[in-house]
Amino acid sequence: MNNRLNTTSSSEESRFLEEMKRKRVNITLSDTEISGVIQKITQKKTLILEDVSEVRSGRRFPGAKLIFGKEIVKVEFPLSAGQASVFSNEKHKSEFQTFKKKMTLDGEEDGVSYVLIDELHEKFGPAVMHIQEQDVIGIGADVYGQSGQERLCWLQVATKKVVYLFDILLLGGPAFKNGLSMILENTHILKVLHDCRCITRCLRTEFRVQLTNVFDTQVAELLLFFNESGGFLPDRPASLPELLQLHLRLTTAEIQPLCSKQQQSRECVQLWYVRPCPPDLLSLMCSSVQHLLSLRLLLLDALLADYTVLVDSFMSSSHCPPLHFQQDECAVPPELQELMCVRQQRMDWASQCYSQTDSGLLQRSSFKASPHTPADAQ
């Protein structure tokens, strides 16, 4: 058995198998396309199908048919009576059409293109080699399943000019054995993510991959909020669209696709299981990671703002030598002593601009602009 999949909990495996069992599936092999009902999925990603027929000729095969994962080129869930599908009812059809109409981001316009990688030939090796040459990369993931029981479907890796979309459902464990693990566990490559919890859990549980050297934009924003409010915490973490709008100044129209992605992922839980994946979804996956590298730099600058101000103050004070040089150098500089006053001023500002929950957290949605900003307190 694949050792990387043995770590999957028995409850998760049972749930996943039960959801996929008895569904009709179309499978494209290298030389033909067959249709059948899923009877079993093994831990080696081998399918056992029953009621099997060849799509083109309609010829039926007696008994069950064994399909090895490495033989599969494409997987589709067709619409048929009595069978569940991602778009098996009019509601989902309507939702998906609305979703497609809202797609406005074009990676080419922003100087970023994407590369789809769904097999371990041709593009996979060069992609891994290119990523390994980077010092900083953006990482994103799309999963299927409830929190704590997710299954990794897509892994996105962003460089400055290219986003690689790895189809983990098709690639499986061999993708990590052949290079992805070395990238994700490399302590010399900084990985920028937004909310690292889900992807860290999936990588560790499914593939025994330990993600290292991570910059989490969601964590960075929480710390920045804490600093700018004088010690308060928000009632919830910020979403990626919120950060892109606040720090990168993206317009509402520019972040709308990301908002749509979050909504559609909630309403259509099997969205990331669709094979072949619609081009609009591929573009959307690209857009969800292409800004992470720029966002990291802005958040770092914001987090270091107080530090920069203090260094400038120290340098300015050096132009006016104190009368008692030795004594002053041993004492705590006045600039540092002022930090407590600045902190109190920021707390007062935050108390005026936000409503508090019963737990003492600040409600993000209640923000009211104030004539005095945290920057005025510096």
Curated annotation (Swiss-Prot):
It is found in: Cytoplasm. It comes from the Eukaryota. Gene3D superfamilies: Ribonuclease H-like superfamily/Ribonuclease H. One of its GO terms (molecular function) is RNA binding. One of its GO terms (biological process) is meiotic cell cycle. Signal peptide: none annotated. The keyword Cytoplasm applies. One of its GO terms (cellular component) is P granule. Keywords: Cytoplasm, Meiosis, RNA-binding, RNA-mediated gene silencing. Pfam families: DNA_pol_A_exo1. Residues 112-304 form the 3'-5' exonuclease domain. InterPro entries: 3'-5'_exonuclease_dom, piRNA_biogenesis_EXD1, RNaseH-like_sf, RNaseH_sf. Its main location: cytoplasm. Disulfide bonds: none annotated. RNA-binding component of the PET complex, a multiprotein complex required for the processing of piRNAs during spermatogenesis. The piRNA metabolic process mediates the repression of transposable elements during meiosis by forming complexes composed of piRNAs and Piwi proteins and governs the methylation and subsequent repression of transposable elements, preventing their mobilization, which is essential for the germline integrity. The PET complex is required during the secondary piRNAs metabolic process for the piwil2 slicing-triggered loading of piwil4 piRNAs. Homodimer. Component of the PET complex. Belongs to the EXD1 family. The 3'-5' exonuclease domain lacks the conserved Asp-Glu-Asp-Asp (DEDD) residues that coordinates divalent ions essential for exonuclease activity. This is piRNA biogenesis protein EXD1. It comes from Danio rerio (Zebrafish).
